[in-house]
Amino acid sequence: MKVYISQLTETENIIDLLEKYEIGLEIVLFASPYCLDRQDEFIENYKIELGDLYGKINLGIHGPYADLIPGARDELITKATNYRMQQAYDVAKKMDANFVVYHNGYYPKTYSYIEWMQRTPTYWNDFKEGKEDDDIKIHIENVHEEDYFLLNELMEEIHDEKTSVCLDVGHVNAYSKVDVMEWMKILKKYIKHMHIHNNFGDRDSHLGINKGELDIIEILNIVKDKDITVTLEITNVDELRESLDILYKNGFIKLREVVKNNV
């Protein structure tokens, strides 16, 4: 298991954490259409902000999601979705990122299960064309799904080792009718990335790992010896620091060599 943190604040607020721990960074900036359209400028800014860490830490990209619908009825919406998602993939290539996370985009109150599955597998299979030789993994994330059936069937239809599930445990707790342990049991062969944050089941709060009703340590113990990446998606920087300290004390992450040598 390799641990990343999500950049939900300015780089200067988390740079010391990246320097202290052996963790990677999942960049959220390119979820913004504005940044995607100016990606070369923002990539150069990132190189400056990360300094000596750039090229030394593992990177992932969180792709765009607002207004994007892979299973859209309207072909124009599908084209816009593909355009933005391809832009994020291009960023991942330019930054030598290991993966891109995309939202599944399913809204239970808007689309029927059958309707969504008629179009979405085709979308993802088409999206993968021409990318066979790339090392970038594609992780499809649950958000508003009420159960795991749709993602399970989607993975069965895609048949690609580089395309997998990003299980967001906070989203499961906030939106699903099914316990997160059941999600993990059913989707275990497809889960290659996870978003880790906590809440009390009433909203998608993105709290620290010890601030909600999920037992995050129990969840991580299930996957700690697997070939999987996990990203802490915690909004409050102090809660992120506390969460990383907990992971360190429980043996999930290590100090960087430069830190250990200076202790």
What are these regions (language model features)?
Residues 1-87, 257-263:
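N-terminal pre-domain/capping segments
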Residues 2, 16-17, 148-155, 160-164, ...:
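Histidine-acidic metal/acid-base catalytic patches
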Residues 3-7, 23-27, 59-62, 100-102, ...:
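Hydrophobic faces of well-ordered beta-strands that scaffold small-molecule active sites
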Residues 6-10, 28-32, 64-66, 105-107, ...:
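Active-site beta-loop-alpha junctions enriched in small/polar residues
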Residues 14-22, 40-61, 88-96, 128-133, ...:
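Acidic (Asp/Glu)-rich catalytic clusters
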Residues 34-35, 67-72, 107-113, 174-175, ...:
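A short acidic, helix-capping loop that chelates divalent metal ions and anchors anionic groups
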Residues 39-46, 77-85, 114-124, 152, ...:
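Charged helix-capping and loop-helix junction motifs
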Residues 70-164, 258:
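Active-site acidic/histidine proton-transfer and metal-coordination neighborhood
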